[in-house]
Amino acid sequence: MAGASAKVVAMLLSVLATYGFAAGVVYTNDWLPAKATWYGQPNGAGPDDNGGACGFKNTNQYPFMSMTSCGNEPLFQDGKGCGACYQIRCTNNPSCSGQPRTVIITDMNYYPVARYHFDLSGTAFGAMARPGLNDQLRHAGIIDIQFRRVPCYHRGLYVNFHVEAGSNPVYLAVLVEFANKDGTVVQLDVMESLPSGKPTRVWTPMRRSWGSIWRLDANHRLQGPFSLRMVSESGQTVIAHQVIPANWRANTNYGSKVQFR
C-alpha cells in the first residue's frame, strides 16, 4: 500500500512538473521591496501600440486603464506572470502619496535594476503621487517602491479568447485575457467537435507560444466548435464549452460566460 501511495504521489508530481503548475498563489498583507521606473508617454499605457509582450491588446482601455507594468523575470516568468495583479506604493519620495495602486503585468522588462523591477506605464508611475504631483514624481525617474500580489477583479467581465492572426485549419493560436483571481493561466487545453457538432470529449493540451498566447500545431484539420479548459496558478479549472464556433475566424474575439472565482 505504501509503495502504491508513493507511486501515486510521484505521478502527481510528474504531472505538476509537466504542466508547470504552482503550488498556489499566496496573498498576504506583507510588502516586498522593489524598484520602479517608467516608460512611454507620461499619461500613456506604456507601449505606443497599447500592447506588450503578453499579447494583450488595448491596454489603455478597461480593465487595464493604462495601469500596466513590465515585469522583470521574477514577475514576468517567461509569460507565466502575464495578467497578474500587484499593489504598489512609494513612500520615500516627497511626491509619493503612500497610497497603494493596482497594476497588471502586461509586458517584459529587459533591464532589471533590482531583484524585483516594475517598469511602469507613465500613468501607473504617476498614480503613486500625491494630488497634482504626478509629473514631479515621474521626474524622479527611478524610485524605491513596495509591492504585493493581490487578486484580480475585472468587474463585469468574463474570460475572453482572441483567436490570433495567422491561425488556420491546422494551427490555432489563442490569447486568454481578463481572468479574475490569479489573473494568470498556467495551462490551456482544447476540445474539438465531431462533424455533427457534438464534442469529442478528448482534451488536447496547447502550449504557451508567448506571453498569454497559447498554440496548437495539429496534424489534422481542426474541427470546431472548440471548448477551452483553463487552469489557474492556484489550480482552479474553468471550462468554456464550445466557446469558439465552427465557422471561427482568425483575428477575432470570442467572449465566454465563464470566470475564475
From Swiss-Prot:
Offer one Pfam family short name for this entry: Expansin_C
Supply the InterPro entries for this chain.
Expan_Lol_pI, Expansin/allergen_DPBB_dom, Expansin_CBD, Expansin_CBD_sf, LolPI, RlpA-like_DPBB, RlpA-like_sf
Location(s), subcellular: Secreted, Cell wall; Membrane
The segment(s) forming the Expansin-like CBD domain are: 170-256
User: Which biological process terms from the Gene Ontology are attached to this UniProt entry?
Assistant: plant-type cell wall loosening; sexual reproduction
List, alphabetically, the GO terms of the cellular component aspect.
Answer: extracellular region; membrane
Keyword Disulfide bond on entry: yes
Q: Which family does it belong to?
A: Belongs to the expansin family. Expansin B subfamily.
Question: What protein does this entry describe?
Answer: Expansin-B2
Annotated organism of origin? Oryza sativa subsp. japonica (Rice)
